[in-house]
């Protein structure tokens, strides 16, 4: 059963401007600890950061909470499996929060074209979970 659907469309120029103005501190406010290695290894750090930010926003929208504790940018890590498929890894407190709400699965899709990044997240819950 669908718990929630979230989408986010982001103009990556906003992220580039933030990096230009605030430097790596800007990235540190967005990235979860698990994302830093891939960020620094990326050929396009601003593009990487834009995709992470959009996915996190879409995740918060699918959850229906917005970005507020424990649903914070640094508690949500956008990761990739061995085939490149994106998924969300959550910090322990966020994992517990999801479990309390009956969220059992998640699906993430990311796309970009030019300066625009699109993220789409679907969260599932068990059929016995009440709204």
UniProtKB/Swiss-Prot annotation:
Subcellular location: Cytoplasm
Top-level EC class: transferase
Reactions this protein catalyses: apo-[ACP] + CoA = holo-[ACP] + adenosine 3',5'-bisphosphate + H(+)
Cofactor requirement: Mg(2+)
GO function terms (MF aspect): holo-[acyl-carrier-protein] synthase activity; magnesium ion binding
E.C. number(s) listed in UniProt: 2.7.8.7
Pfam family name, one: ACPS
Alphabetized InterPro entries for the sequence: 4-PPantetheinyl_Trfase_dom, 4-PPantetheinyl_Trfase_dom_sf, ACPS, Ppantetheine-prot_Trfase_dom
Gene Ontology annotations for the cellular component aspect, listed alphabetically: cytoplasm
Annotated Mg(2+) binding sites: 8, 57
Keywords noted in UniProt: Cytoplasm, Fatty acid biosynthesis, Fatty acid metabolism, Lipid biosynthesis, Lipid metabolism, Magnesium, Metal-binding, Transferase
Main location per the UniProt record: cytoplasm
Coiled-coil portions: none
One of the GO biological process terms: fatty acid biosynthetic process
NCBIfam families in alphabetical order: acpS, pantethn_trn
Chain's role: Transfers the 4'-phosphopantetheine moiety from coenzyme A to a Ser of acyl-carrier-protein.
Similarity annotation: Belongs to the P-Pant transferase superfamily. AcpS family.
HAMAP family linked: AcpS
Entry protein name: Holo-[acyl-carrier-protein] synthase
Organism: Thiobacillus denitrificans (strain ATCC 25259 / T1)
Taxonomic lineage of the native organism: Bacteria, Pseudomonadati, Pseudomonadota, Betaproteobacteria, Nitrosomonadales
